């Protein structure tokens, strides 16, 4: 929603541009892929800050069951342009058990991420993803990869599991249908406009 996007924008713009001020923010998935203002804010964040890490959290641990969240780790640059060179993403969501009251998320579930994170020292990081290990949870994407994505989406997945299609709640499926319907309606509207111009 706009509130969440504004919240993110407020945080990174409030950081001192000294190359040291940093933040880690928990945000729902839609902030990673919302179009319009969402894309503008993501591009601004990638410019003004070094968005070096995204941790994809298991479903339903912060909000209502079914809501997907992420932690964005970033450092404000000294300039306002070109601060992000690469984004490292750790997928703690795919192929993980469902967490809740009966199966709480524990500190040890973060052990591998903490080791991969390497205290934020990018030079010490090593991907666990490779062509030989396509389900490695830790993967690096260049800024060119990110900017080339539709709407500069940061909602990136690569791990494939047999249960991928079974993990959606009814509400999530409705959200997906709604989003796809909006995209289709927009495309139809643009097509109608184009046809109208041709016929004129």
Residue ranges, per PLM feature:
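A conserved structural/catalytic subdomain of Rossmann-like adenosyl-cofactor enzymes
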Residues: 1-200
